[in-house]
Regions:
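Surface-exposed substrate-engagement region within the catalytic domains
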Residues: 30-57, 183-303
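Substrate-binding cleft of extracellular glycoside hydrolase catalytic domains
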Residues: 70, 78-176, 194-195, 200-202
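Cleavable N-terminal signal peptides
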Residues: 11-12, 22
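Bacterial N-terminal signal peptides that target proteins for export
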Residues: 1-9
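Structural recognition of the beta-strand scaffold that forms the well-ordered cores
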Residues: 27-30, 62-66, 89-94, 132-137, ...
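N-terminal carbohydrate-binding/catalytic regions of secreted carbohydrate-active enzymes
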Residues: 26-126, 281, 285, 290-295, ...
């Protein structure tokens, strides 16, 4: 797998003419209190615990923040401070945009634009001057289904642009990645414009395949297409972070707890242009569907985790 990825990176470097941070494989924070780690410690006699410990708990994963955090600034600060103490870089996901998931399995988010601005302000203040990787609002640029009017779409773009600005101001050492959906969702032609309008010019880059299953090569091809359009229309290109947490077997066309998914390349294979990261936490449910028909979105399941380890 690593050899194949190195070959792909060699190809993509010719297409992406940006520079950026090169992260060492051990740069990123491994949270000893992640849900898989806590579950494995609390169920040490369960045969699934050893598998989860061996395959998942030692890999850096993102921590997601949303309206379930009663004090988001304090929650973010606690996570970032723990990473600082370990001399590692945390990966965070901001996930509180109004009309989140268009009312789907992960519905929720801030009540309105003002509430979101206050929330992202607090989120960014929690990071402060620490280094961090931040993925901003998964699906928010790809999922315009519930934004029926131009005004509603413009409001979404303006909120994301504000989020980038507030993160740059309050968390100047953070690498900010706007989410851009996945390789088989929104046409690159459309996504390039949305990214630009959402302030990608002021961000580090864009994120792909968050919580999805598409092979890394497909995401790289899509990133190249988007970057080509950003270059021709706006005069810049951007690095990309790709969620590889569950793309080891690629996609079968299903997005919600599909059977046959497998863990992908672990966090840390990176160049200045491409960062691979486990953004979705392996074992967390996508919703009550697929091989987890009774599991709410975001709930950790050891059975789902073991399925990803074994690829079934």
């Amino acid at each position: 797998m690593k050899k194949r990825f190195a070959q792909v990176v060699g190809i993509v470097l010719a297409a992406l003419f940006v520079t950026g941070q090169t992260w060492a494989a051990d740069s990123f924070y491994v949270d000893p209190n992640s849900e898989p780690a806590v579950w494995a410690r609390n169920h040490a006699d369960d045969p699934r615990a050893a598998k989860i410990t061996e395959s998942i708990t030692h890999v850096p994963t993102a921590q997601w923040f949303g309206s379930w955090n009663k004090d988001v600034r304090a929650a973010v600060s606690q996570f970032v401070n723990a990473a600082d103490a370990a001399h590692q870089v945390p990966i965070l996901v901001a996930y509180d945009i109004p009309n989140r998931d268009c009312g789907g399995a992960s519905a929720g988010g801030a009540a309105d634009a003002d509430a979101y601005r206050a929330w992202i302000e607090a989120f960014s203040q929690g990071i402060g001057k620490s280094q961090a990787v931040v993925v901003v609002e998964p699906d928010s640029l790809a999922q315009f289904d519930c934004l029926k009017t131009t005004d509603a779409q413009d409001a979404r773009l303006n909120l994301l642009s504000d989020a980038v600005s507030r993160l740059r101001l309050n968390a100047p050492a953070a690498d900010i990645y706007l989410d851009a959906g996945n390789a088989n969702w929104t046409a690159a032609d459309v996504m390039a414009n949305r990214l630009h309008d959402a302030g990608i010019g002021e961000a580090k880059g864009f994120a792909l395949n968050v919580s999805n299953f598409y092979p890394t090569q497909e995401s790289i091809a899509y990133a190249n297409a988007v970057n080509g359009l950003l270059a021709s229309r706006f005069g810049y290109t951007k690095p990309v972070v790709i969620d590889t947490s569950r793309n080891g077997n690629g996609s079968n066309g299903q997005w919600c707890n599909p059977a046959g998914a497998k863990l992908g390349e672990p966090t840390g294979d990176a160049t200045g242009q491409i960062l691979l990261a486990w953004i979705k936490n392996p074992g967390d449910s996508d919703g009550p569907c697929g091989v987890g028909p009774t599991l709410k979105a975001g709930v950790f399941s050891p059975d789902l985790a073991v399925r990803l380890i074994e690829g079934n």
